[in-house]
Amino acid sequence: MAEEKRPVKITETVLRDGHQSLIATRMRTEQMLPIIDKMDKVGYYSVEMWGGATFDACLRFLDEDPWDRLRKLRDGFKNTKLQMLFRAQNILGYRHYADDVVEYFVQKSIANGIDIIRIFDALNDVRNLETAVKATKKEGGHVQTAISYTLGEPYTVEYFCHLAKQMEDMGADSICVKDMAGLLIPYEASKLFKALKETVKIPLQMHSHYTSGVAAMTYMRAVEAGCDIIDTAMSPFALGTSQPATEVMVKTFQGTPYDAGVDQGLLLEIADYFRPIREECLASGLMNPKVLGVDINTLKYQVPGGMLSNLVSQLKDQHAEDKFYDVLKEIPAVREDLGMPPLVTPSSQIVGTQAVMNVLFGERYKVATKETKALLRGEYGQTVRPFNKEVQKKVLGEDAEIITCRPADLIPNELPKLREEVGEYLQQDEDVLSYALFPQVAMNFFKERAAGFPAKAEREKKAAEEKAAKEAAKNAPAKAEVPKEVIKYVPAPAPFLGAVPGYIPAAGEIPAGLPAEGAAAPFAPGQSAEGSGSVNGASLNYKINCVE
């Protein structure tokens, strides 16, 4: 008897997580628009193109209105569902927001074109999903709740199945296993999806990253065990810290009961479109070749690749690279102290930065970040395990008030105050939401917008001039080579004496516009926190960067 056909569905991530993972979310809307007509004809289940770090990056780095991007992509995708990633009560920011802000953001997201909202909480605290789920259902959107997958003693198949059942009961239309670190290995995926399929009746989706090198094999086992949908990225923006390649996974399932049935010819044309963009990113340094390989440390230390990169960056800033393995050993201990949270934004940054502080200060929790304090106070929600009471007491003090309810229950409505603060810069209803998430960044954007984006125009002019110069150089006639027998008669140049001790160049000799040095944020557009302290009299600065 022939095996029953169960075509796997494809969610394409090249317009969101693909470029977020490989080029720090720097793909511009203008680079997306020319190809979306072809993408719309492929037969994707959905295209993930908004949310996550794209919102912050548009405002902070690209001088783009993220709402404008959403509207333009909606206009182009006539037949394909559009999907976004939503951090539950954190929306797309790095703190909990009042319910009225969450509800309004969901309303405007769906009104502007989003069909599917993938909602996850960093702690897997389902209370933090409630408002976003209800708001999405009210607006007629598809609710996809996501399980933040991680490893550790409490995180059993039974735990994940219980979580999935809670999500189904609260109204989820589908559930995604969100493996942000690439930790789920193939045969474990078989067990997990078989159990999930027996527990819930709604569709199941798998999201992973290729960081550890196993994601494509994990997808195969997950699909065979009942997974209905997989996240993939077009090959120019796949692999490494991104997802498995769309073309490869589609070809893998061809001719099997799981054949996706999408247009493979169109996929090749789409890959051809994105390939020059990738090459441009490599040439400019925007895409670091290091993020394209397999990082086996992800499996060894059970932490996301982006978190490892962030740790290296922090230690390099403090000239303490030799402490890297000490910090890696400290991470599991800190994670245990803080209730064993999944290592995804913002908990991955909280755990990682606190581990760095503990090692560099030579005493555990001598200095605690404000985010560590907030987590221990219960401001982010409930962790899978209780906090270490001694650590909680040391960090917060004896009489600290601990939050045990849903954290957002304690946050009063924010929208009226936010509208007042935006004031004259409000040009559209959505502006208040941009300001709510990133007040300073959004206000800078509003002012630039009001002035006609002069800085953006100057950058674009300079980029056009540089491109024209490169084209001219490429098309210029080749220079005649000087015969070798002539070269030996050319006198050697005088030695360069630029680095003369004690020499200070005059102001006019220093080239304008040199970039300032700073900590790299390879997997994110911004930081959720920063601060400082001192070690043996030397200053210590820390920054927390977004990973997912």
Residue ranges and their predicted role:
Residues 155-167, 212-228:
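Catalytic cores of alpha/beta
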